Amino acid sequence: NLFINRHYFSQIYINNLSDASFSTTFAYTNNMKIRKATYEDIPRILHIFAEARTTMRESGNLHQWPDTYPSEEIVRKDISNGHCMVCCDEEGKIQGTFACIPGPDPTYAKIYEGSWPDEEPYYVIHRIAASRDAGRKSSIASCCFEWTFRRTDTIRIDTHRDNVIMHHLLSKHGFHRCGVILLANGDPRDAYHKRKI
């Protein structure tokens, strides 16, 4: 059973993971198995994104992700670059996904209505989403943040001002709102930062 002594295996595997390459070796976090996505995972990832768009709209966040975002092309690029991760349950079913990308992010170079607390190296989390049958969505976020903090001391992330769910999750996990950044298309996003204690 792969989930026996998962925390023991997690420490062994994570100690051997390369920050640059994100080895495909599994890492266990909060009963979830996190691994690099493959092209075979794309249909499930796109399904989770579709569910996330529905959840956003039901909660009043109507504009963050249009129907075409995140596109299959974006997912393929994330996978090709080794940035797309999936969170799997004990049966191996993908219940969440996120992109973990080493900084610097060009859209974070300028921040308005505030400032970044430091200029230390960081990783950026983009396109985080959980399936509707994943149970508590915060568990996917917890897995994502814990996994990323094993690779960096600082995480930056942004979200739409209307994404009440994500604002709540970020606050719950100790992220601090630093200001507003502009995406490449000029759309504003609330920018968050957390440094590992």
Show where each model-derived region lies:
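Conserved GNAT-fold acetyl-CoA-binding loop/helix
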Residues: 53-73
